[in-house]
């Protein structure tokens, strides 16, 4: 669920999940459109896509079993639906951790009007 996801984010980044990632770029937070603004925003884009694939599992509210081991996150729920949701959150939290050095405060509270499709 979102609380567990927040704990994963804090563990992997040392940042406040709500204040740092709750409204960042075009995809971190509720909804999303356009092109991700940077690597952190792309983590959110991928996470949104993952939640889309497991939508029938109620990902924002589904409570799953996981643990922190050797600096990593282990999803160990026996329920396949819950484990799938956990994996979405785990991959995103790791992604945030891998991109914490390029996190840019200018994308915090980024106006959605700037989130448009880019021409290829």
From Swiss-Prot:
It is an enzyme of class 3 (hydrolase). Binds 1 Ca(2+) ion. Disulfide bonds join 26-115, 28-44, 43-95, 50-88, 57-81, 75-86. Its main location: secreted. Its EC number is 3.1.1.4. GO terms for molecular function: calcium ion binding; calcium-dependent phospholipase A2 activity; phospholipid binding; toxin activity. It holds the Pfam family Phospholip_A2_1. InterPro entries: PLipase_A2, PLipase_A2_Asp_AS, PLipase_A2_dom, PLipase_A2_dom_sf, PLipase_A2_His_AS. The keyword Metal-binding applies. It is found in: Secreted. Expressed by the venom gland. GO terms for cellular component: extracellular region. Gene3D superfamilies: Phospholipase A2 domain. Its cofactor is Ca(2+). Ca(2+) binds at residues 27, 29, 31, 48. The keyword Hydrolase applies. GO terms for biological process: arachidonate secretion; lipid catabolic process; phospholipid metabolic process. This non-toxic acidic phospholipase A2 hydrolyzes monolayers of different short chain phospholipids. It exhibits anticoagulant effects upon human plasma in vitro. PLA2 catalyzes the calcium-dependent hydrolysis of the 2-acyl groups in 3-sn-phosphoglycerides. Is non-lethal to mice up to a dose as high as 25 mg/kg by intraperitoneal and intravenous injection. PANTHER family: BASIC PHOSPHOLIPASE A2 PA-11-LIKE, PHOSPHOLIPASE A2 FAMILY MEMBER. Belongs to the phospholipase A2 family. Group II subfamily. D49 sub-subfamily. This is Acidic phospholipase A2 Cc1-PLA2. It comes from Cerastes cerastes (Horned desert viper).
């Amino acid at each position: 669920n979102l609380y567990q996801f927040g704990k994963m984010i804090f563990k992997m980044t040392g940042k406040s999940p709500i204040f740092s990632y709750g409204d960042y770029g075009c995809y971190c937070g509720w909804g999303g459109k356009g092109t991700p603004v940077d690597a952190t925003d792309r983590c959110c884009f991928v996470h949104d896509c993952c939640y889309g694939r497991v939508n029938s599992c109620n990902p924002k509210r589904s409570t799953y079993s996981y643990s922190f081991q050797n600096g990593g996150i282990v999803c160990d729920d026996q329920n396949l639906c819950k484990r799938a949701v956990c994996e979405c959150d785990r991959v995103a939290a790791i992604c945030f951790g891998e991109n914490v050095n390029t996190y840019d405060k200018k994308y915090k509270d980024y106006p959605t009007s700037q989130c448009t499709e880019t021409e290829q």
